[in-house]
């Protein structure tokens, strides 16, 4: 057992107690750490593979039950948004698992893209470990509370908010939104971006995220929400 991992602390964050703690240790072991540590023989990659499938099943079931009249294509669009790397990274942040990741010295997370990838893989690996140890029920209990509310899922079914905002402003105002970017730092001290979306010299929405693309999407969605654009499109969903 690796003494660098506080098993009890991680279990408390997951609200799940492992009968096989070694599974959790493996899930928290980045391949780079195994490569640099002769006493470590397993890493998280196989558990990531399993966890990816478990996450897909849980999210699919959740959407299927939440939207009983929704067609398959629209459900697939929402599912893709809820299981992508950015979302999985957010789940890791919400659970506070990142600080427990064992990663090699040569694999330091130096930018947002590397962090997103490592944290997304971490969530999938931990979910795979929970599934192997306790089955689908505890994996579901961990995952579902992390998912957005029904109201927040609805916009995901309509596609990229930047595209929708552009269509709105072109159709109704015959103009295009302008995105202004300034530096931003998260509560964890990670540098990111603050985006303001301007329409006709007026701030319609703002968003902050670790990636510029995600911050722009958040700002665009805030703009759509503020101008009540989504309501007429999602009332019957």
From Swiss-Prot:
Keywords tagged on the record: Cytoplasm, Endonuclease, Hydrolase, Magnesium, Metal-binding, mRNA processing, Nuclease, RNA-binding, rRNA processing, rRNA-binding, tRNA processing
GO molecular function: double-stranded RNA binding; metal ion binding; ribonuclease III activity; rRNA binding
EC top class, as a word: hydrolase
Recorded catalytic activity of this chain's protein: Endonucleolytic cleavage to 5'-phosphomonoester
Active-site residues annotated for this sequence: 52, 124
SMART domains found in the cross-reference section: DSRM, RIBOc
EC number of this enzyme: 3.1.26.3
Domain of life per record: Bacteria
Residues the entry annotates as binding Mg(2+): 48, 121, 124
Gene Ontology annotations for the cellular component aspect, listed alphabetically: cytoplasm
Complexes and interactors: Homodimer.
Protein name according to UniProt: Ribonuclease 3
Organism ancestry: Bacteria, Pseudomonadati, Chlamydiota, Chlamydiia, Chlamydiales
Gene name per UniProt: rnc
């Amino acid at each position: 057992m690796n003494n660098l991992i506080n098993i009890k602390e991680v279990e408390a964050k997951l609200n799940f107690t492992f009968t096989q703690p070694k599974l959790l240790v493996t899930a928290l072991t980045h391949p780079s750490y195994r490569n640099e540590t002769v006493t470590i023989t397993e890493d998280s990659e196989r558990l990531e593979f399993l966890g990816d499938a478990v996450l897909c099943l849980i999210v699919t079931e959740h959407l299927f039950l939440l939207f009983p009249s929704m067609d398959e294509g629209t459900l697939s669009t929402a599912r893709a948004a809820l299981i992508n790397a950015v979302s999985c990274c957010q789940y890791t942040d919400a659970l506070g698992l990142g600080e427990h990741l064992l990663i090699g010295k040569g694999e330091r997370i130096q930018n947002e893209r590397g962090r997103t990838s490592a944290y997304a893989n971490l969530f999938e690996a931990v979910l795979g470990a929970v599934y192997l140890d306790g089955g689908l029920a505890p994996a579901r209990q961990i995952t579902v509370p992390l998912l957005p509310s029904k109201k927040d899922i609805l916009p995901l079914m309509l596609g990229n908010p930047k595209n929708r905002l552009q269509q709105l402003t072109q159709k109704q105002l015959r103009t295009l939104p302008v995105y202004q970017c300034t530096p931003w730092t998260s509560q964890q001290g990670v540098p990111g971006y603050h985006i303001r979306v301007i329409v006709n010299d007026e701030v319609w929405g703002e968003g902050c995220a670790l990636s510029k693309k995600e911050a722009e999407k958040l700002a665009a969605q805030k703009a759509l929400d503020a101008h009540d654009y989504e309501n007429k499109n999602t009332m019957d969903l």
